[in-house]
Amino acid sequence: MSRATQANPSVQAVPGLSFTAAKAQGHATRDEALAIFDALEPVALDFMIGAWKGEGFETGHPLDGVLERCHWHGKRFESEEHVHPLVFRKVSGKLTSVKPLLTMPGLGLLDQMPFLNSAFVGKVFQWILPLLSGRKSAARLRTTIYRGVATATMKYDNLPINDVFRKVDDHTVLGIMDLKGMKQPFFFVLRRDDR
């Protein structure tokens, strides 16, 4: 029995579909993405320390592409206690950490107002980034059990969100954003940013 079916018997492993194949075809179904996630190795906390560049992992979720259109750069894990969960690129090209509480209202509106998921809104967001920026960390790292496996998880300080990670390779993790009340998980990829 695969790790995917052990973690959740209702998710069937998809023969031949790997993380690499899903990225190459540009999308996966929710069940395919969950099977891929479940088949990956857990992540130790110290593995996550450092800067990471983010990218999408398309599954048909309303948030697919939103972060990229808003010039999301990734995440920065300074220590287990100090994490910057939302790092964006300003118009100047410099990176800035955003206060998660200030961005949350827009997430709930995406289903009702899909026009918010547009390049224009992303450009406007980039111009107002200085108003949303903060220097303090807004999350921490903990090991949690998710889908039956203990793995590194980024827990937001003031929001009901956990980002759970599984290891693709020494430089890449697949993440799931687990937001209380969200009907389906949101997937994303982080790659080490050694600049």
What spans do the regions from the language model cover?
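Soluble ligand-binding/transfer domains with enclosed cavities or grooves
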Residues: 4-195
